[in-house]
From Swiss-Prot:
SMART domains for the chain: BRCT, HhH1, LIGANc
Task of the protein: DNA ligase that catalyzes the formation of phosphodiester linkages between 5'-phosphoryl and 3'-hydroxyl groups in double-stranded DNA using NAD as a coenzyme and as the energy source for the reaction. It is essential for DNA replication and repair of damaged DNA.
Catalytic residues (positions): 114 (n6-amp-lysine intermediate)
Keywords, comma-separated and alphabetical: DNA damage, DNA repair, DNA replication, Ligase, Magnesium, Manganese, Metal-binding, NAD, Zinc
Protein name: DNA ligase
Cofactor(s) needed by this chain: Mg(2+); Mn(2+)
Gene3D superfamilies: 5' to 3' exonuclease, C-terminal subdomain, 6.20.10.30, BRCT domain, DNA ligase/mRNA capping enzyme, Helix hairpin bin, Nucleic acid-binding proteins
One GO BP: DNA replication
Species whose genome carries this gene: Nautilia profundicola (strain ATCC BAA-1463 / DSM 18972 / AmH)
Chain ranges of the BRCT domain: 577-656
Entry binding sites for NAD(+): 32-36, 81-82, 112, 135, 169, 284, 308
């Protein structure tokens, strides 16, 4: 019986310990009955003394608030995607790239399972869980703190007091997934397609009480912002697990490639027997000092890959082939399949890529084929079982005319294009893309509405969206006045949209969200007034990207200007740069320094320096730390100014 606050605190600590052993270590210390008894005693004390409730008490995991929607939440540091490798050759190619960048092969690999769930970012400050965010687009997610607190394997309090982002995957056991679907069937509710959908859907419930009923598990796999000082990723993760998080099986360190391949084989064998869904193995360079040297592409860190499991394959029949027309006019053949279940998902369609591929594989309607599905990759046909042919299979001819507008197509071999800019499919898909989440994000303007607007002659180009009137929309099927007003207001609200969203919405080939942000940071809204060679200066922009931008601007200059006049996009806020000896200079960092290189890089960039990854005659300074390598030698050879890290700090202090 709890008599006073001291008894209460002891009871809470005991409950925390029991919960940790049960949910994290899978090693219960007491019976469920004993746990429930103490839990209810703690609850009773808290009801009588609401002013003395410990916020980290297990009873506080579930709140009574039902949200109207989720607030957007900006991650303290970006949550990157991961490059996928699907076989030994792909993996060896990645290792080869790492060796080339580092200039040696003195590194090891940290290995861990790749869970097939929903990514979550936890932020702890002063040891308390202050926020939990979904991955979102990698920079901005949704605040799901109340739901995350209901997951028993997420500690509400940790011993690490510094600000830290702990990242991981929310998953559900396969058995629990089956039980959940059985329950939903009984209640007449739609079932979840697979455990990942169940985990993601449970995490995004507006009522935390529903999330609390779902047996979700959280496995950490990394960190974002942190002030930890570890030399190896494996040591860093050892520390994270010591904070009270659930540790996955089979993680470890490999010194060489044969060890990695052996681990991969072990994971493949573990795949079916493991309690939650795995879709591969994550391989990271263990030495943290090499992470900054390896750097990042526009999407991925170069120091890690997801070594995916072999795809699951099934046999089925091609019942038909339809041809889709994208916003760029490319005709893509898609196989309509006899429905087949692959890895818990019903597959009814598979990409055929292009008509050259159809001819190469001799694919016909009516063929028995092998279809594979791997992770998020669109299902595809890998083999035609020609020996099962009966003679009534139909060849698939190359189209000579667009299946949507009837215009003659341009056949370039692998690509067949409809060149009619007014083709309904091209126009509708352009509108859908323009309004999509990572572009203008116009609420209520999805595929069905875009088709309606086009079919009723209200929109022939994205610029027409801004001429829409409530009275015109009211005449459309299923458009009541309120819905019409909402759409018009949603479109009008995009005036003053961020520059990068505007550029991304233009749909320039090879230019996605990350590239759009770089264009806006460099040139702002008037990017279209700059010469092609100026785009070459942007880090990561290759010849194809530059050519694509130049061609788009040449053809669409008037349209860009009209949209700018309508939307008045906002340029990124320019940070006020304090004048330093490095302002406007090109700098290269090399060697091990007293602070993480990423920190020094950001500091220099905030001062207006351009921090490059390679040394050339245009480099102003090479700043070196301990064990400086080939960049130091190259700078010496080219006569580039060499500064030790101490010299850098001295120059900053003296301001010269």
């Amino acid at each position: 019986m709890i008599k006073d606050y001291n008894d209460y605190k002891k009871a809470v600590d005991t409950l925390k310990k029991w919960a940790y052993y049960y949910y994290v270590l899978d090693n219960p210390l007491v019976t469920d009955e004993e746990y429930d008894k103490l839990y209810h005693e703690v609850e009773e004390y808290e009801k009588k003394h609401p002013d003395k409730i410990d916020p980290t008490s297990p009873t506080q995991r579930v709140g009574d608030v039902v949200l109207e929607g989720f607030e957007k939440a900006k991650h303290l540091s970006r949550m990157w995607s991961m490059e996928d490798v699907f076989n030994e050759k792909d993996f060896l190619d990645w290792v080869g790239r790492v060796k080339r960048i580092l200039g040696h092969e003195n590194f090891s690999f940290y290995i861990e399972p790749k869970f097939d769930g929903a990514s979550l970012n936890l932020i702890y400050e002063n040891g308390k869980l202050i926020r939990a965010e979904t991955r979102g687009d990698g920079e901005i997610g949704e605040d799901v703190t109340l739901n995350a607190k209901t997951i028993n394997s997420i500690p509400l309090e940790i011993k690490e007091k510094s600000l830290i982002e702990i990242r991981g995957e929310v998953v559900i056991k396969k058995d629990d997934f089956d039980k959940l679907n059985e329950e939903r069937l009984k209640n007449g509710e739609p079932t979840f397609a697979n455990p990942r959908n169940a985990a993601a859907g449970s995490l995004r419930q507006l009522d935390p009480k529903i999330t609390a009923k779902r047996p979700l598990i959280f496995y950490p796999w990394g960190v974002g912002v942190n002030s930890l000082n570890y030399e190896r990723y494996s040591e860093l993760m050892d520390y994270i697990y010591s904070l009270g998080f659930k540790e996955p099986p089979k993680r470890g360190v490999c010194k060489d490639i044969p060890c990695v391949e052996k681990k991969y084989d072990e994971f493949v064998k573990l795949r079916d027997s493991f309690e939650v869904m795995l879709d591969g193995m994550v391989v990271k360079i263990d030495e943290i000092k090499y992470h900054d040297i390896l750097g990042y592409t526009q999407k991925y860190p170069r120091w890690m890959v997801a070594y995916k499991f072999p795809a699951i394959e099934k046999e089925t029949i091609i019942e038909d082939v339809i041809v889709q027309v994208g916003r760029t006019g490319v005709l893509t053949p898609v196989a309509v399949l006899k429905p087949v279940e692959i890895g818990g998902v019903i597959v009814e369609r598979a990409t055929l890529h292009n008509f050259d591929e159809i001819e190469r594989m001799d694919i016909r309607i009516g063929d028995h084929v092998i279809v594979i599905r791997s992770g998020d990759v669109i299902p595809k046909i890998t083999k035609v079982l020609t020996w099962k042919r009966k003679g009534d299979e139909k060849p698939i001819p190359r189209p000579t005319h667009c299946p949507v507008c009837g215009a003659e197509v341009l056949d370039e071999g692998a690509l067949i294009k409809c060149q009619n800019l007014s083709c309904p499919a091209r126009v509708v898909n352009t509108i859908i893309y323009f309004a999509s989440k990572n572009c203008l994000d116009i609420e209520g303007l999805g595929e069905s509405v875009a088709k309606l607007l086009y079919e009723h002659g209200l929109v022939k180009d994205v610029t027409d969206l801004f001429e829409l009137k409530v009275e015109d929309l009211e005449k459309l099927p299923l458009f009541a006045r309120k819905k019409a007003e909402n759409l018009v207001n949603a479109i009008k609200s995009k005036v003053g949209v961020e520059c990068w969203r505007f550029v991304n919405a233009l749909g320039i080939e090879h230019i996605g969200e990350v590239a759009s942000k770089k264009i806006c940071e460099k040139f702002g809204v008037e990017f279209y007034k700059h010469a092609p060679e100026e785009f070459e200066e942007i880090e990561g922009f290759g010849p194809e990207m530059v050519k694509s931008i130049a061609e788009y601007i040449r053809v669409n200059k008037e349209k860009i200007e009209k949209l700018i006049e309508i939307l008045k996009p906002k340029n990124p806020e320019k940070k006020e740069v304090q004048k330093t000896p490095f302002t406007g200079k090109t700098v290269v960092l090399t060697g091990t320094m007293s602070k993480p290189r990423s920190e020094i890089k950001k500091m220099l960039e905030d001062m207006g320096a351009k921090v490059s990854s390679s040394v050339s005659k245009k480099t102003d300074f090479v700043i070196y730390g301990e064990d400086a390598g080939s960049k130091y030698d190259k700078a010496k050879k080219l006569g580039v100014n060499l500064l030790s890290e101490d010299d850098m700090w001295k120059m900053l202090k003296e301001g010269k």
